[in-house]
């Protein structure tokens, strides 16, 4: 088991390893002293792990209540958020009680935002069950729901009390969902760690789960510790995301987040090569490694539709847009471009 300490406004530990769900009651009791726990999950994850977690927490002395919703991004809405707040109030949760988010990124984002706002803030614990959530969304305190106008447009920075990444849960993931998480794993190598990217290129999907997840969490820790509120270098973690969010929205969220980010990284790296910011060999290597992991390389969406959807992104500021660009493996930067130039960037990335 690997332990990583996150030193932000609220310090907490991230544990990565096998069998953590079996010990969740003891580990949660160390940080949450209240009487009641609300387990928030989607219907898919609940069917796999919900009853076992509920029993473990009940046996550990907690009064457990649960809230589930249909799996998928389409549930990360004001309506689901409102129902969750009502559930917490109706079950009498107080500020000394705790929410446990059991699931992927949608579950963590929604449960975290409810924790941040219910009674002006109660404790919550992240138990991510997808690779993507383990290496990205469960760490760093970003919580949010979607609005009709765009993704993650209502949210808060609110750190969890604990994160438990049980690698055993990865065995139940559909292949496509696991590969989604690989897009975020590869992002860390491209941004920060050429040695990690070399190892992933060699090992492919056989990579050691605990080692790689732990390394990604360490890299995320470094970014979050330096810039908790996403005003500077933490923005590098958005590599591929501005275009990726545009692809997700333009595709009516029928394209998964990981697949969209993978396409976003391809498009931006190709555009960087076309604009002279990186060597074409760098863009081609990124594409080749994404290919090794079976991540998509094409979209039938045109540059205009992607751009229109991307312009609602939070990284827009007036008539400019912040775009994370790749100059080399391990060397990325934030470029501010006019919003009317974004379509040309996307077109350049699509046309190569």
Over which residues does each language-model region extend?
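ATP/NTP phosphate-donor binding region
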Residues: 1-97
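A glycine/threonine-rich phosphate-anchoring loop and its flanking beta-alpha core
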Residues: 15, 113-203
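Generic secondary-structure signature for well-ordered alpha-helical cores
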Residues: 58, 159-163, 168-175, 183-195, ...
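Short glycine/serine/threonine-rich phosphate/pyrophosphate-binding segments
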Residues: 106-113, 134, 246
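C-terminal charged capping/lid subdomain of soluble metabolic enzymes
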Residues: 183-185, 277-352
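Solvent-exposed alpha-helices and their adjacent loops that cap or buttress functional pockets
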Residues: 92-94, 117-118, 146-147, 154-158, ...
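Active-site segments that bind and position negatively charged phosphate/pyrophosphate groups
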Residues: 198-305
């Amino acid at each position: 088991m690997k332990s990583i300490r996150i030193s932000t406004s609220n310090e907490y530990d991230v544990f990565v390893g096998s069998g953590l769900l079996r010990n969740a009651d003891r580990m949660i009791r160390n940080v949450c002293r209240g009487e009641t726990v609300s387990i928030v999950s989607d219907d898919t994850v609940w069917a796999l792990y919900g009853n076992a977690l509920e029993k473990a927490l009940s046996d550990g002395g907690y009064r457990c209540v649960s809230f589930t919703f249909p799996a998928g991004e389409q549930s990360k809405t004001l309506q689901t958020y409102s129902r969750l707040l009502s559930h917490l109030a109706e079950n009498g949760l107080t500020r000394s009680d705790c929410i446990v988010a059991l699931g992927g990124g949608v579950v963590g984002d929604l449960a975290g935002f409810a924790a941040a706002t219910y009674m002006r803030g109660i404790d919550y614990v992240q138990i991510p069950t997808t690779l993507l959530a383990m290496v990205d969304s469960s760490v760093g305190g970003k919580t949010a729901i979607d609005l009709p106008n765009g993704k993650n447009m209502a949210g808060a920075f609110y750190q969890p009390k604990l994160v438990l990444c049980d690698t055993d849960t990865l065995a139940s993931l559909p292949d496509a969902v696991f590969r989604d998480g690989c897009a975020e794993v590869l992002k860390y190598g491209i941004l920060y760690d050429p040695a990690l990217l070399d190892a992933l290129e060699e090992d492919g999907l056989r990579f050691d789960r605990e080692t790689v997840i732990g390394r990604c969490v360490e890299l995320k820790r470094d970014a979050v510790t330096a810039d908790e509120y996403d005003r500077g270098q933490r923005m590098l973690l958005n590599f591929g995301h501005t275009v990726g969010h545009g692809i997700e929205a333009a595709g009516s969220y029928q394209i998964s987040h990981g697949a969209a980010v993978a396409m976003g990284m391809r498009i931006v790296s190709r555009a960087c090569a076309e604009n002279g910011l990186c060597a074409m060999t760098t863009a081609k290597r990124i594409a080749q490694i994404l290919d090794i992991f079976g991540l998509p390389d094409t979209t039938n969406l045109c540059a205009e539709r992607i751009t229109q959807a991307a312009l609602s992104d939070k990284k827009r500021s007036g008539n400019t847009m912040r775009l994370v660009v790749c100059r080399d493996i391990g060397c990325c930067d934030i470029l501010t471009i006019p919003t009317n130039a974004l379509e040309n960037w996307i077109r350049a990335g699509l046309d190569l």
